[in-house]
Protein backbone atom coordinates (compact mmCIF):
# COMPACT_ATOMS: atom_id res chain seq x y z
CA UNK A 1 0.00 0.00 0.00
CA UNK A 2 1.41 3.39 -1.02
CA UNK A 3 1.23 5.71 1.96
CA UNK A 4 1.07 9.42 1.17
CA UNK A 5 0.26 12.55 3.14
CA UNK A 6 -3.14 14.17 2.81
CA UNK A 7 -2.96 17.49 0.96
CA UNK A 8 -3.50 19.43 4.20
CA UNK A 9 -0.62 17.54 5.89
CA UNK A 10 1.63 18.14 2.89
CA UNK A 11 0.72 21.84 2.91
CA UNK A 12 1.60 22.06 6.62
CA UNK A 13 5.01 20.47 5.98
CA UNK A 14 5.73 22.76 3.03
CA UNK A 15 4.71 25.86 4.98
CA UNK A 16 7.15 24.93 7.75
CA UNK A 17 9.98 24.12 5.31
CA UNK A 18 9.46 27.47 3.56
CA UNK A 19 9.49 29.42 6.83
CA UNK A 20 12.81 28.30 8.38
CA UNK A 21 11.16 25.43 10.24
CA UNK A 22 12.14 21.86 11.08
CA UNK A 23 10.08 18.73 10.45
CA UNK A 24 10.45 15.14 11.63
CA UNK A 25 9.49 12.52 9.05
CA UNK A 26 9.74 8.77 8.41
CA UNK A 27 12.49 7.39 6.16
CA UNK A 28 13.45 3.90 5.06
CA UNK A 29 14.77 2.96 8.51
CA UNK A 30 14.34 5.66 11.17
CA UNK A 31 12.72 9.04 11.65
CA UNK A 32 14.65 11.95 10.23
CA UNK A 33 14.86 15.65 10.98
CA UNK A 34 14.67 17.88 7.94
CA UNK A 35 14.64 21.44 6.74
CA UNK A 36 15.35 23.61 3.72
CA UNK A 37 19.01 23.05 2.74
CA UNK A 38 19.20 26.65 1.50
CA UNK A 39 18.23 28.09 4.90
CA UNK A 40 21.17 28.26 7.29
CA UNK A 41 18.91 29.37 10.17
CA UNK A 42 16.87 26.17 9.81
CA UNK A 43 20.01 24.01 9.56
CA UNK A 44 21.31 25.64 12.76
CA UNK A 45 18.02 24.67 14.46
CA UNK A 46 18.58 21.02 13.53
CA UNK A 47 22.14 21.10 14.87
CA UNK A 48 20.90 22.65 18.13
CA UNK A 49 18.00 20.20 18.37
CA UNK A 50 20.31 17.20 17.95
CA UNK A 51 23.21 18.78 19.87
CA UNK A 52 25.32 17.79 16.84
CA UNK A 53 28.58 19.52 15.89
CA UNK A 54 28.54 21.21 12.49
CA UNK A 55 31.87 19.69 11.39
CA UNK A 56 30.20 16.29 10.87
CA UNK A 57 27.99 17.46 8.01
CA UNK A 58 24.46 16.38 7.12
CA UNK A 59 22.72 14.27 4.47
CA UNK A 60 20.57 15.64 1.66
CA UNK A 61 17.62 13.45 0.70
CA UNK A 62 15.79 13.97 -2.59
CA UNK A 63 13.14 12.63 -4.94
CA UNK A 64 15.53 12.58 -7.93
CA UNK A 65 19.19 12.95 -8.78
CA UNK A 66 18.34 16.18 -10.60
CA UNK A 67 17.26 17.76 -7.30
CA UNK A 68 20.75 17.11 -5.92
CA UNK A 69 22.73 18.72 -8.76
CA UNK A 70 22.70 22.19 -7.14
CA UNK A 71 24.51 20.71 -4.12
CA UNK A 72 26.56 17.79 -5.47
CA UNK A 73 29.03 17.97 -8.37
CA UNK A 74 28.32 14.70 -10.15
CA UNK A 75 30.49 15.88 -13.09
CA UNK A 76 33.58 15.02 -11.02
CA UNK A 77 32.59 11.33 -10.95
CA UNK A 78 33.42 8.86 -13.69
CA UNK A 79 30.64 7.41 -15.82
CA UNK A 80 31.16 4.06 -14.08
CA UNK A 81 30.84 5.62 -10.61
CA UNK A 82 27.67 7.44 -11.62
CA UNK A 83 26.20 4.24 -13.07
CA UNK A 84 26.80 2.41 -9.78
CA UNK A 85 25.12 5.22 -7.82
CA UNK A 86 22.11 5.38 -10.13
CA UNK A 87 21.58 1.60 -9.83
CA UNK A 88 21.07 2.00 -6.06
CA UNK A 89 18.50 4.82 -6.32
CA UNK A 90 15.81 5.32 -5.35
CA UNK A 91 16.66 3.37 -2.25
CA UNK A 92 18.28 3.30 1.19
CA UNK A 93 21.85 3.95 0.00
CA UNK A 94 23.58 7.26 0.75
CA UNK A 95 26.61 8.25 -1.31
CA UNK A 96 29.45 10.62 -0.42
CA UNK A 97 30.09 12.65 -3.58
CA UNK A 98 31.99 15.84 -4.44
CA UNK A 99 30.09 18.94 -3.32
CA UNK A 100 29.46 22.07 -5.32
CA UNK A 101 31.97 24.78 -4.40
CA UNK A 102 29.36 27.10 -2.86
CA UNK A 103 27.75 24.48 -0.60
CA UNK A 104 27.19 25.61 2.99
CA UNK A 105 29.69 24.16 5.46
CA UNK A 106 26.68 23.46 7.69
CA UNK A 107 25.80 20.74 5.16
CA UNK A 108 29.25 19.51 4.09
CA UNK A 109 30.90 19.93 7.48
CA UNK A 110 34.69 19.82 7.32
CA UNK A 111 34.62 18.02 3.97
CA UNK A 112 34.79 18.87 0.26
CA UNK A 113 31.99 16.36 -0.27
CA UNK A 114 28.33 15.92 0.54
CA UNK A 115 26.23 12.92 1.56
CA UNK A 116 23.24 12.46 -0.77
CA UNK A 117 20.41 9.98 -1.26
CA UNK A 118 17.44 9.59 -3.59
CA UNK A 119 14.84 8.08 -1.31
CA UNK A 120 12.29 5.39 -2.04
CA UNK A 121 10.10 6.36 0.93
CA UNK A 122 6.81 7.61 -0.58
CA UNK A 123 6.21 10.39 1.95
CA UNK A 124 9.71 11.84 1.69
CA UNK A 125 9.51 11.65 -2.11
CA UNK A 126 6.13 13.41 -1.96
CA UNK A 127 7.57 16.19 0.21
CA UNK A 128 10.69 16.66 -1.96
CA UNK A 129 8.63 16.70 -5.17
CA UNK A 130 6.22 19.29 -3.77
CA UNK A 131 9.09 21.34 -2.26
CA UNK A 132 10.92 21.05 -5.60
CA UNK A 133 14.28 20.36 -3.95
CA UNK A 134 15.94 18.05 -1.45
CA UNK A 135 15.68 18.42 2.30
CA UNK A 136 18.21 17.91 5.05
CA UNK A 137 18.07 14.40 6.49
CA UNK A 138 19.61 13.44 9.80
CA UNK A 139 18.35 10.90 12.29
CA UNK A 140 15.78 12.17 14.79
CA UNK A 141 17.68 11.81 18.03
CA UNK A 142 19.99 13.62 20.35
CA UNK A 143 23.59 12.92 19.35
CA UNK A 144 24.80 9.61 20.81
CA UNK A 145 21.27 8.30 21.51
CA UNK A 146 19.32 5.76 19.44
CA UNK A 147 17.31 7.21 16.56
CA UNK A 148 13.54 7.42 16.86
CA UNK A 149 11.61 4.72 15.00
CA UNK A 150 8.15 6.28 15.34
CA UNK A 151 6.44 9.63 15.64
CA UNK A 152 5.66 8.76 19.28
CA UNK A 153 9.37 8.30 20.02
CA UNK A 154 10.17 11.62 18.31
CA UNK A 155 7.52 13.40 20.38
CA UNK A 156 8.85 11.82 23.58
CA UNK A 157 12.49 12.62 22.78
CA UNK A 158 11.91 16.26 21.82
CA UNK A 159 8.81 16.85 24.03
CA UNK A 160 8.48 20.58 24.37
CA UNK A 161 11.40 21.65 22.19
CA UNK A 162 10.12 24.55 20.11
CA UNK A 163 12.83 24.05 17.47
CA UNK A 164 10.85 21.10 16.08
CA UNK A 165 7.76 22.42 14.31
CA UNK A 166 6.06 19.30 12.92
CA UNK A 167 6.20 15.54 13.45
CA UNK A 168 4.67 13.56 10.58
CA UNK A 169 2.70 10.63 11.97
CA UNK A 170 3.49 7.83 9.52
CA UNK A 171 5.56 4.64 9.62
CA UNK A 172 9.16 4.12 8.57
CA UNK A 173 9.66 1.65 5.71
CA UNK A 174 10.89 -1.07 8.03
CA UNK A 175 14.63 -1.48 7.44
CA UNK A 176 16.09 -2.83 10.66
CA UNK A 177 19.40 -1.00 10.30
CA UNK A 178 20.28 2.59 9.36
CA UNK A 179 20.70 3.27 5.67
CA UNK A 180 24.11 2.38 4.28
CA UNK A 181 26.66 5.03 3.33
CA UNK A 182 29.26 4.51 0.58
CA UNK A 183 32.05 6.73 -0.74
CA UNK A 184 31.49 7.27 -4.48
CA UNK A 185 35.15 7.53 -5.49
CA UNK A 186 36.33 4.42 -3.62
CA UNK A 187 33.13 2.37 -3.41
CA UNK A 188 34.04 1.73 0.24
CA UNK A 189 31.17 1.23 2.68
CA UNK A 190 31.39 3.73 5.54
CA UNK A 191 28.29 2.61 7.47
UniProtKB/Swiss-Prot annotation:
Reactions it catalyzes: L-threonine + hydrogencarbonate + ATP = L-threonylcarbamoyladenylate + diphosphate + H2O
GO cellular component, one term: cytoplasm
One GO-annotated biological process of the protein: regulation of translational fidelity
Gene Ontology terms for molecular function: ATP binding; double-stranded RNA binding; L-threonylcarbamoyladenylate synthase; tRNA binding
Top-level taxon: Bacteria
One Pfam family, short name: Sua5_yciO_yrdC
SUPFAM superfamilies given in the database record: YrdC/RibB (SSF55821)
Family: Belongs to the SUA5 family. TsaC subfamily.
Name the UniProt record assigns to this protein: Threonylcarbamoyl-AMP synthase
Organism: Psychromonas ingrahamii (strain DSM 17664 / CCUG 51855 / 37)
Lineage per the UniProt record: Bacteria, Pseudomonadati, Pseudomonadota, Gammaproteobacteria, Alteromonadales
Gene from which this protein is expressed: tsaC
Amino acid sequence: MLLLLKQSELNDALKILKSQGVIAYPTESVFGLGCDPDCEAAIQKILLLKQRPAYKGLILIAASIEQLEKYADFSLLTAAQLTVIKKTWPGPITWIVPSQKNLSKLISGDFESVAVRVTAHPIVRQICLAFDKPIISTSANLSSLEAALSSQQVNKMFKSNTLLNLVIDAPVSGLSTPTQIFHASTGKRLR
